[in-house]
Amino acid sequence: MGEITNVMEYQAIAKQKLPKMIYDYYASGAEDEWTLKENREAFSRILFRPRILIDVSKIDMSATVLGFKISMPIMIAPSAMQKMAHPDGEYATARAASAAGTIMTLSSWATSSVEEVASTGPGIRFFQLYVYKDRNVVEQLVRRAERAGFKAIALTVDTPRLGRREADIKNRFVLPPYLTLKNFEGLDLAEMDKSNDSGLASYVAGQIDRTLSWKDVKWLQSITSLPILVKGVITAEDARLAVHSGAAGIIVSNHGARQLDYVPATISALEEVVTAAAGRIPVYLDGGVRRGTDVFKALALGAAGVFIGRPVVFALAAEGEAGVRNVLRMMREEFELTMALSGCTSLADITRAHIYTDADRLARPFPRL
């Protein structure tokens, strides 16, 4: 293959390089994978209304997330077990994020520990958290993330049980024997049993707390001073509850279409959540973001920033740290170009009037003058 010109090209390379079980784990979605496809396709139904003859010789893409200044509103979502993709795993991702001046979110189910990732050098990092049945485990994880200098907790709230990922069932997915879930070493929670199903599904069934509810968000606030992002909100009702719970922010996410199939694409759910949050807390988005144009569309619909997951893992598999750096560079350059061609010189310039959605077409066939 010649020069990589967009982030999607890394997926084909990753598919060639990775064992089938590992590629399928990263790439697949739940059941019919309708939402997996829709996460991408919904972006293609949003069109631009660019403004012209505006001086775009200087463009500022910098963003502030929970008080932290970053170079662009494009961050790295938590993706589990990255050493399956490349021996450097989360180390490489952390270094690439830091070099790009943006935020990495480390998965609870990482193959590198919070301490190891912190040792890669300075950087703004968030820690993604699942709530285990044993709350002592949760407290230990949060304390360790705090000590390692992590700046926020991204609490995943859409996984009381693991979605039915049929590729993982067919492949009997299990973490390869040479790897462990590093954050759980010494807690008897670092390995998965080979089972007649997906090993990860069995692990979740055994360890993750199905009783998790809004009161536990309050409990989490009682054990940490770190801001808590609620990750997995896709309705107005839950957005209002997230605000009421004292969350520092919301991540509109359908878990990469890996949990409940036939939920809307995150970009389709975004405006409802933003409207319900009513500016009280910031709203972020993950799911299906592959282009700078996607980033712009999310910001026009009210997102304060986006997270990318699979593109990072596929680039990691293809080219290690250099691949992740390249993904962040391409996304940044595409986003900057989209801003310029839309007549925007800062994030504050990006408005709802810059895009045209399915809902707009139903409400009025042509924009009012």
Curated annotation (Swiss-Prot):
GO molecular function: (S)-2-hydroxy-acid oxidase activity; FMN binding
Pathway(s) it belongs to: Photosynthesis; photorespiration; glycine from 2-phosphoglycolate: step 2/3
Motif (Microbody targeting signal): 367-369
GO cellular component: peroxisome
GO biological process: oxidative photosynthetic carbon pathway; photorespiration; regulation of photosynthesis; response to other organism; symbiont entry into host cell
UniProt-annotated catalytic positions: H255
Enzyme Commission numbers on file: 1.1.3.15
Residues binding glyoxylate: Y25, Y130, R165, H255, R258
Subcellular location: Peroxisome
Key words, A-Z: Flavoprotein, FMN, Glycolate pathway, Host-virus interaction, Oxidoreductase, Peroxisome, Photorespiration
Entry binding sites for FMN: 78-80, 107, 128-130, 156, 231, 253, 286-290, 309-310
Principal location: other
Pfam families: FMN_dh
Task performed by this protein: Catalyzes the oxidation of glycolate to glyoxylate, with a reduction of O2 to H2O2. Is a key enzyme in photorespiration in plants. To a lesser extent, is also able to oxidize glyoxylate to oxalate in vitro. Can exert a strong regulation over photosynthesis, possibly through a feed-back inhibition on Rubisco activase. Does not seem to play a role in oxalate accumulation.
Protein name, entry field: Glycolate oxidase 1
Origin species: Oryza sativa subsp. japonica
